[in-house]
From Swiss-Prot:
Residues 25-213 are extracellular. It comes from the Eukaryota. Belongs to the CD200R family. Residues 122-206 form the Ig-like C2-type domain. It comes from Gallus gallus. The chain crosses the membrane at residues 214-234. Residues 235-300 are cytoplasmic. Keywords: Disulfide bond, Glycoprotein, Immunoglobulin domain, Membrane, Phosphoprotein, Receptor, Repeat, Secreted, Signal, Transmembrane, Transmembrane helix. PROSITE patterns: IG_LIKE. GO terms for biological process: regulation of neuroinflammatory response. Glycosylated. This is Cell surface glycoprotein CD200 receptor 1-A.
Amino acid sequence: MEIAGKAVCVFLLLAIIKLRRSEGINRVSANLGHNTVMTCPTRTNISMVTWKINPKTGHQCTLAYRIDKDSTGKTNCSDRINWRSRPDWDQALEIQQVGKADEGNYTCEVVNADGNFHRLYHLTVIVAPRMALYCDDYGNPVCEAETEKSAAEISWVPESNSTPRADSHDNGTVTVVSWFAARSTNGKNPTCIVSHATLNETKSINCSSSYRDLILCIAIILSFLIIITFMAVIYYLKLHGCRFCHRSKPPDIIPTYSSQDDTVEVEPYTTYVQKENVIYNSVSDLTLRQNLPQGQSPAT
């Protein structure tokens, strides 16, 4: 019985292996920011294809295609992860602009009448080291080195007095920046030396004084143009302001009096005087008559 049980187990195991036809794990790598493609087992008369993605961080992603219904499905997958072409004739998976979060295990399962066939991948994202040497806006040499995980070491020839600055990023890279700050180069071009497990590179640069002279010349010209423009605006405002100030004022209006107005003003006074005289004469005559003896009349 024990031997029969073992035989059954072996038979079942062989059947499962035959049906699943799983291959070994294929280790692949992709450069950060580049595209990568993974293919499925080549089989005929496929009825269904499924990609199962298990990243180190995040949720599982699934892409599926059914031949009989000519339909595709996508679950929890980024827009960057998709079929390379039409899945009915090309079942390859393409990842655009690979990031560190895409690291993990990728499995393609192909189903046909002969069984299920698998191909497994383990994706590793590589950050290619990068070195850059340039002159800043002040004509000083600047050296940059971008590497993965550990920071690179930067040194200068001649020796520089500056301290490098290291910045860590979310994608797992570290950027080191160093400014050349030596007092004298003895006529030699500054040389930047980058040391790292994945990068050993040396570059030289000449940030000559002509570069700084060019910047200074441009600054002087711009300043001169700004001053000229400012003076022109002031002159324009002053010119138009004086025009408004010197506009001819309306002449002072001198009141004029006509002889008719004088006559109108004098006539009331004359009438008044005449009335006074008449009243005075009447009173005088009455008084004189009262003082005369009876029978006499005042002389005229």
